[in-house]
């Protein structure tokens, strides 16, 4: 029986590379996408034409109920999540002086709240099965900070604390 790995933000960049590596290691790979993402069909077809067999599910990782619904659907369709990779992330880079509350909230909700929302849905099952892995993709900016990335650095620092 192969294990199920779910990667948030798996449709590009680092997330896509993680999906490919997990597939190479024998995992059934599932990724999430933001509802309304017009690129998902083409991306999924391209990846599956290469033989990966990925599945993709809509999930607003910033919303606890959406995360729960997503994990419930994945569990029914593919199986329980054994590996969760919290990779979803965005930036809204600008000086703090120019940053709006909406800019702050968007980054904190996507980069930090999502870690709680997704982890909360899978942890009990992993504990019951006595096997599971949760990987939180951080950034050095969470430790050192970066000009123009107050919100991003704060979110990644929060993720670091959450993980510890």
Predicted region positions:
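Conserved glycine-rich cofactor-binding loop
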Residues: 11-12
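Conserved glycine-rich Rossmann-like NAD(P)H-binding loop of the short-chain dehydrogenase/reductase
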Residues: 25-41
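The beta1-alpha1 cofactor-binding region of Rossmann-like NAD(H)/NADP(H)-dependent oxidoreductases
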Residues: 37-38, 58-69, 101
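Substrate-binding pocket helix/loop in short-chain dehydrogenase/reductase
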Residues: 95-96, 103-108
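Active-site loop immediately N-terminal to the catalytic Tyr-X3-Lys motif
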Residues: 97, 144-150
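Active-site helix of classical SDR
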Residues: 119, 155, 163
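Residue(s) in the substrate-gating loop at a strand-loop-helix junction
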Residues: 139
């Amino acid at each position: 029986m192969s294990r199920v790995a779910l990667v948030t933000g798996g449709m590009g960049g680092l997330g896509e590379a993680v999906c490919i590596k997990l597939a190479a290691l024998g995992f059934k790979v599932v990724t999430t996408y933001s509802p309304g993402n017009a690129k998902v069909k083409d991306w999924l077809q391209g990846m599956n034409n290469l033989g990966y067999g990925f599945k993709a599910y809509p999930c607003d990782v910033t919303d606890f109920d959406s995360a729960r619904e997503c994990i419930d659907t994945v569990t029914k369709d593919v199986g329980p999540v054994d590996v969760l990779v919290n990779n979803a992330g965005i930036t809204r880079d600008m000086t703090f002086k120019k940053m709006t509350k909406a800019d702050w909230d968007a980054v904190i909700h996507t980069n930090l709240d999502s870690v709680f929302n997704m982890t909360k849905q899978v942890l009990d099952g992993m504990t019951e099965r006595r096997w599971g892995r949760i990987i939180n993709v951080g950034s050095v900016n969470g430790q050192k900070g970066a000009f123009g990335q107050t919100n991003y650095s704060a979110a990644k620092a929060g993720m670091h604390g959450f993980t510890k």
